[in-house]
């Protein structure tokens, strides 16, 4: 009986390969150019695959038996029957056994239409079944497709093989060990890539993403603009929110959509960027410089006398009656609407309190 000691016997001859040679064949190449030629006793492209009876060794002994390889090793191996009259292969090894995982996968030719072989994945278990301990050693076993009786040539007799323990003269096996460390390295690379992507995101978008968790209940509400028409006394401009974005309007239309804390710069006026309440950082300050020629919202004549509850705050100079407007609006809003939000006019009334310098939302 052949010794199971990997140190016994001379090492297999090393193939004469050019520098930089790598052996990474596809499944089709392994079956067509190596296994099929080996079964037909035809010359191989290169003598790089050793002939070893894998089931007489434990998997950690096999790298020393290989002709070539560093992380994975290839072998031609015979396959025996488990029982003389059965078709099941014998998977027992020296100190354990190989267990198949999943179903056989067909190996197709490059055109994708012809089946040239079968691939089976196996895992090595130490001990005796069924209480074996699963290891990290993996085997991919390639075998040729079986010849159907109607495809066998006339006069071909396999009677001598029926009573033999030999199931296949040759199968081709790839052996490797799963490396948990490499998987951790791959995960670290994924995390590094995610961090790199987030570092490339502008701070305004990052802050917006961080604050979305505080406003998940608004996601089922229409994303249309929450527009509150009204008129302000004195020079200034209007601010409103549409759920995730804060926009500034002048008399002609939108000047800036500042999201949660973005910044825009143009000409002449200062404005405070709004930031949703969160623990991610202090309030962001933004400067908006632009000449605002019209101090009022564009409203129709019939809306000039609209009730204070349908007006919104202006921010800027001369806002003498802004606090009165805020007080009136809060007084006329039902308590439930003040707590949870409700429909006011055509939009959603948001009661989120923003700390704006010089402006008291709840002053009477």
Curated annotation (Swiss-Prot):
Primary localisation category: nucleus
Localization, UniProt: Nucleus
GO CC, alphabetical: nucleus
The entry's DNA-binding region: 116-184
PROSITE patterns linked to this entry: NAC (PS51005)
Region (Disordered): 1-23
Compositional bias per record (Pro residues), positions renumbered to this chain: 9-18
Tissue: Stamen specific, in anthers from stage 8. Expressed in the outer integument, but seems not expressed in the embryo at the torpedo stage.
Stated induction or repression of this protein's expression: By Jasmonic acid (JA).
Knockout or disruption consequences: When associated with disruption in NAC018/NARS2, abnormally shaped seeds, defect in embryogenesis sometimes arrested at the torpedo-shaped embryo stage thus leading to partial embryonic lethality, markedly delayed integuments degeneration, and delay of silique senescence.
GO BP annotation list: integument development; regulation of embryonic development; response to jasmonic acid; seed morphogenesis
The NAC domain, residue ranges: 17-178
Record key words, sorted: DNA-binding, Nucleus, Transcription, Transcription regulation
GO molecular function, one term: DNA-binding transcription factor activity
Record's comment describing the protein's domains: The NAC domain includes a DNA binding domain and a dimerization domain.
Functional summary from the UniProt entry: Transcription factor of the NAC family. Together with NAC018/NARS2, regulates embryogenesis by regulating the development and degeneration of ovule integuments, a process required for intertissue communication between the embryo and the maternal integument.
Entry protein name: NAC transcription factor 56
Organism (species): Arabidopsis thaliana (Mouse-ear cress)
């Amino acid at each position: 009986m052949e010794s199971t000691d990997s140190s016994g016997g001379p090492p297999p001859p090393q193939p004469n390969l050019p520098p930089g040679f790598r052996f990474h064949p596809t499944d089709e190449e392994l079956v067509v150019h190596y296994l099929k030629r080996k079964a037909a006793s035809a010359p191989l492209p290169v003598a790089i695959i050793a002939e070893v009876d894998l089931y007489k060794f434990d998997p950690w002994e096999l790298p020393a038996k290989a002709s070539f390889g560093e992380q994975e090793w290839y072998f031609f191996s015979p396959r025996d029957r488990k029982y003389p009259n059965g078709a099941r292969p014998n998977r027992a090894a020296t100190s354990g056994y190989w267990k198949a995982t999943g179903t056989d996968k067909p190996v197709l030719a490059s055109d994708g239409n012809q089946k040239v072989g079968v691939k089976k994945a196996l895992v090595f278990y130490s001990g005796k079944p069924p209480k074996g301990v699963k290891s990290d050693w993996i085997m991919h076993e390639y075998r040729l497709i079986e010849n159907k009786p109607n495809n066998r040539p006339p006069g071909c007799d396999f009677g001598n093989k029926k009573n033999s323990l030999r199931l296949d003269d040759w199968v081709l096996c790839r052996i490797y060990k799963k490396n948990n460390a490499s998987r951790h390295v791959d995960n670290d690379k994924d995390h590094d890539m995610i961090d790199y992507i987030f570092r490339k995101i502008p701070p305004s978008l990052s802050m917006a993403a961080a604050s979305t968790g505080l406003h998940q209940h608004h996601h089922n509400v229409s994303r249309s603009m929450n527009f509150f028409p009204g008129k302000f006394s004195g020079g200034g401009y209007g601010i409103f929110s549409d759920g995730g974005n804060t926009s500034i309007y002048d008399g002609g239309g939108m000047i800036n959509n500042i999201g949660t804390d973005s910044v825009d710069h143009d000409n002449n006026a200062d404005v405070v960027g709004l930031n949703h309440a969160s623990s991610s950082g202090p309030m962001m300050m933004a400067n908006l410089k632009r000449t605002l020629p019209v101090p009022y919202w564009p409203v129709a004549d019939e809306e000039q006398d609209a009730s204070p509850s349908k007006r919104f705050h202006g921010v800027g100079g001369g806002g003498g009656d802004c606090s009165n407007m805020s007080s009136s609006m809060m007084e006329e809003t039902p308590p439930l609407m003040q707590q949870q939000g409700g429909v006011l006019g055509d939009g959603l009334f948001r009661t989120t309190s923003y700390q704006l310098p010089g402006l008291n939302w709840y002053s009477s």
